[in-house]
């Protein structure tokens, strides 16, 4: 979604080259072409770029500033021309998401643009119903049905790293490696293309290997702080009664679990409540932010 502070904003649901996206963006240019803009990327994770102010709960690179987003953005009012956030809001409660958008509005200059990317609840529901309505005789229905249910629900209920989505990736990768049947191979290729058209990519790495790789990389010097923080949380969790342990562990998977879902209507209304206007839908290829796709 792109939006403007008392101007317009942009909402994008699933910013992938091959996936349907929802974007809301403003119509007016916020800066003359060639003039340097101040740009903020909050909740950036591992996706950040020079020329932007990148902030997140944990820093994975010197270009990323460590900030507790739920305590507010450490910037003065009207500091930025552009605010961007991709796949962040869905990991927070609606109340927390509203606070983050209020902070974004506060730090944006008049006529500044916000561009928000979240999973598209409407598209997921429509695709689920479309697959469900396919005849049972369709040989590809079962696999597609399994995937769309995982895509819709897994990150809402996930209680372990990678969840059912990781298991699906592993099974698909292994099946394609092992099959010698041409018909089965084509069926698996069709399934892979279907999933890629939905999410944009499928990890080729065995989720189990990726799990251990993550833990090895976590001990690199720049990640030691984050590693120790998570180790501390899990140690505390281990000392809690079983009834509370799962709740605490779930709280440590904020980067994986979804706390809410949005569509064009709900996210547009939320942006308007905060103060944004001129909300529109766009895709990953279009933006009124000058040179946005060059970053």
Regions found by a protein language model. Name each.
Residues 98-110:
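A short glycine-rich, Lys/Arg-flanked "PGG" loop and its adjoining helix->strand segment in the class I
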Residues 82-88, 97:
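A short beta-strand submotif of the Rossmann-like class I SAM-dependent methyltransferase core
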């Amino acid at each position: 979604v792109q939006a403007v502070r008392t101007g317009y904003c942009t909402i994008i649901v699933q910013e992938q080259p091959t996936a349907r996206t929802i974007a809301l963006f403003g119509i007016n240019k916020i800066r003359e072409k060639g003039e340097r803009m101040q740009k903020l990327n909050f909740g950036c994770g591992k996706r950040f770029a020079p020329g932007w102010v990148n902030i997140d709960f944990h820093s994975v690179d010197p270009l990323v500033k460590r900030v507790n987003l739920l305590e507010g953005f450490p910037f003065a009012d009207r500091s930025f021309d552009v605010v961007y956030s991709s796949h962040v809001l869905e990991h927070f409660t609606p109340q927390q998401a509203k606070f983050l958008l209020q902070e974004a509005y506060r730090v944006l200059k008049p006529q500044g643009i916000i561009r928000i990317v979240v999973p598209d609840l409407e598209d997921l529901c429509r695709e689920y119903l479309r697959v469900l309505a396919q005849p049972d005789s369709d040989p590809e229905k079962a696999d597609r049905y399994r995937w769309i249910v995982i895509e819709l629900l897994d990150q809402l209920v996930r209680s372990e790293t990678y969840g059912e989505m990781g298991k699906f990736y592993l099974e698909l990768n292994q099946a394609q490696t092992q099959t010698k049947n041409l018909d089965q191979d084509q069926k698996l290729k069709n399934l892979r293309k279907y999933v890629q058209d939905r999410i944009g990519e499928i990890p080729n790495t065995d989720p189990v290997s990726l799990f251990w790789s993550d833990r090895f990389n976590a001990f690199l010097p720049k990640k030691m702080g984050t590693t120790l923080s998570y180790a501390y949380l899990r140690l505390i969790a281990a000392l809690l009664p079983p009834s509370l342990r799962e709740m605490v562990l779930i709280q440590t998977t904020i980067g994986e679990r979804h706390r809410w879902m949005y569509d064009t209507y709900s996210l547009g209304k939320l942006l308007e409540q905060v103060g944004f206007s001129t909300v529109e839908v766009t895709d990953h290829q279009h933006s009124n932010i000058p040179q946005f796709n060059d970053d």
